[in-house]
UniProtKB/Swiss-Prot annotation:
Native species: Limosilactobacillus reuteri (strain DSM 20016)
Enzyme class: transferase
GO cellular component: cytosol
Domain of life, per lineage: Bacteria
Keyword hit for tRNA-binding: yes
Any one biological process term the GO annotation gives: thiamine diphosphate biosynthetic process
A GO term, aspect molecular function: CCA tRNA nucleotidyltransferase activity
Name of the molecule in the record: Probable tRNA sulfurtransferase
EC code: 2.8.1.4
InterPro entries: Rossmann-like_a/b/a_fold (IPR014729), ThiI_AANH (IPR020536), ThiI_fer (IPR054173), ThiI_N (IPR049961), THUMP_dom (IPR004114), THUMP_ThiI (IPR049962), tRNA_STrfase (IPR003720), tRNA_sulfurtransferase_ThiI (IPR050102)
Keywords: ATP-binding, Cytoplasm, Nucleotide-binding, RNA-binding, Thiamine biosynthesis, Transferase, tRNA-binding
Compartments it resides in: Cytoplasm
Catalytic reactions of this protein: [ThiI sulfur-carrier protein]-S-sulfanyl-L-cysteine + a uridine in tRNA + 2 reduced [2Fe-2S]-[ferredoxin] + ATP + H(+) = [ThiI sulfur-carrier protein]-L-cysteine + a 4-thiouridine in tRNA + 2 oxidized [2Fe-2S]-[ferredoxin] + AMP + diphosphate; [ThiS sulfur-carrier protein]-C-terminal Gly-Gly-AMP + S-sulfanyl-L-cysteinyl-[cysteine desulfurase] + AH2 = [ThiS sulfur-carrier protein]-C-terminal-Gly-aminoethanethioate + L-cysteinyl-[cysteine desulfurase] + A + AMP + 2 H(+)
HAMAP family listed in its UniProt record: ThiI (MF_00021)
Length: 406
């Protein structure tokens, strides 16, 4: 069956009151961005539904893109027919013939926005349901409460639209409706999941990745970019900000006691992330910390690290077990990349026994040994920004260096 359009139903947007229009407008922009490669597709974002006119585009390909767009509760492929009962009945019979191969229960559910149409919703439900029962007596039985199949009929000004399938969307809120966040992106399992969860709540993410050549390899940088590419399919594109961090790590290792290396390094990372957030008009910093998962992720450690900024530091996976984080990573296709064995700057210079309950005052005292302003300025002067789009391959750009490790 050649579908005419896809009817998209909103998720939480239906509860947004006076802000609903801005949320719907943003969702329309995001859907158009997700479907930009389909030249013939037209997107119409309306108050109660979003309609994607296929105009001959491949339904399966369009559907796979829509599944990744946050803010969509579900959607249904539909066909458009002339505004007559005869055309509606013929199309409905074709749908049943193609989709039903064993006895099932069903119901007809009609919405009518064109109140000039001669048949009202109650009459359409009864008349069309009776027609289908007569035509398929061995296949169909009515159940209005828990049917196996719901045949939806929408009577609009420009035609009648029929659908019988409902496909689950990504849920959440449209990316961009909650403002911009700076994600402290490592190459591990947790931070891509945290970024995904933040994006699902409407945050437009920019990735901040600290790299420390020669202590970290080109492979580690390429892996972080490829992880960002996996996440870009949820928002269209993501800016990746790489921050040189080797000088800071070397200086901290030289001047700070071993037990506080991790704490001071992370305080410097947070300072840099906050500086970038201000410069790039963000509203919050995100990271992948999970309470108690490793020695540096205690509440005392978080308190000592957060001391350097008054801006919000949000941790979407804070209360998740590792198994829960891994499950999400597998679902969003980042897990296999995350476990590739390339060290990032969070794992180099790691002391054997970091302080699990660092003292804030002591951390401040140790930092007096550092030229914090100079170190930060040189790091910020060396940043590089890459716009990462879905489908880009950063691993093959490093094929030679990867080959010896794979």
């Amino acid at each position: 069956m050649q579908y005419t359009e896809i009817m998209v139903r909103y998720g939480e947007l239906s509860t947004k009151g006076h802000n609903k229009k801005s949320f719907i407008d943003r969702l329309g922009v995001n859907v158009r961005k997700a479907l930009h490669s389909f030249d013939q597709v037209k997107v119409h974002a309306q108050r109660d539904r979003l309609h994607v006119e296929l105009n001959g585009a491949d339904y399966d390909q369009v559907m796979n893109r829509l599944k990744l767009v946050f803010g969509i509760q579900n959607f249904s492929p539909s066909i458009k027919v002339d505004k007559t009962f005869e055309a509606t009945a013929e199309a409905a019979a074709q749908m049943i013939a193609e989709q039903v191969d064993k006895p099932i229960t069903f119901k007809v559910e009609t919405r009518r926005s064109d109140h000039q149409f001669a048949i009202d919703t109650f009459e359409m439900n009864n008349k069309l349901g009776g027609y289908l029962l007569d035509k398929f007596p061995d296949k169909l039985k009515v159940d209005v409460h828990h049917p196996d199949l719901t045949l939806r009929v929408e009577i609009r000004l420009n035609g009648i639209f029929l659908s019988s399938e409902t496909i689950k969307g990504a849920g959440g809120l449209p990316v961009g409706t909650a403002g911009k966040g700076m994600m402290m992106m490592s190459g591990g399992i947790d931070s891509p999941v945290a970024a995904y969860l933040g994006m699902k709540r409407g945050v437009s993410m920019e990735m901040v990745h600290f790299f420390s050549p020669p202590y970290t390899s080109p492979q580690a940088l390429a892996k972080a970019k490829q992880l960002t590419e996996r996440l870009a399919k949820y928002s269209g594109s993501i800016k990746f900000i790489q921050v040189p961090f080797a000088e800071i790590q070397e200086t901290v290792k030289e001047k700070v006691p071993e037990g506080y290396l991790m704490t001071i390094q992370r305080r410097m990372m947070l300072r840099l992330a906050a500086a970038l957030m201000i410069k790039r008009h963000g509203l919050a910093i995100f990271n992948g910390e999970s309470l108690g998962q490793v020695a540096s992720q205690t509440m005392e450690s978080m308190l000592a690290i957060n001391d350097v900024t008054s801006y919000p530091v949000l941790r979407p996976v804070l209360s998740f077990d590792k198994t829960e984080i891994i499950k999400i990573a597998q679902d969003i296709d980042t897990y296999d990349l995350s476990i590739l064995p390339y060290e990032d700057c969070c794992t180099v210079f790691t002391p054997p026994s970091p302080k699990t309950r660092p003292n804030v005052k002591r951390a401040r005292e140790y930092e007096k040994r550092l030229d914090i302003e100079g170190l930060m300025q040189r790091a910020l002067d060396g940043i590089e920004i890459t716009e990462i789009h879905p489908g880009e391959d950063y691993l093959n750009q490093n094929e030679d260096v990867f080959a010896e490790l794979l």
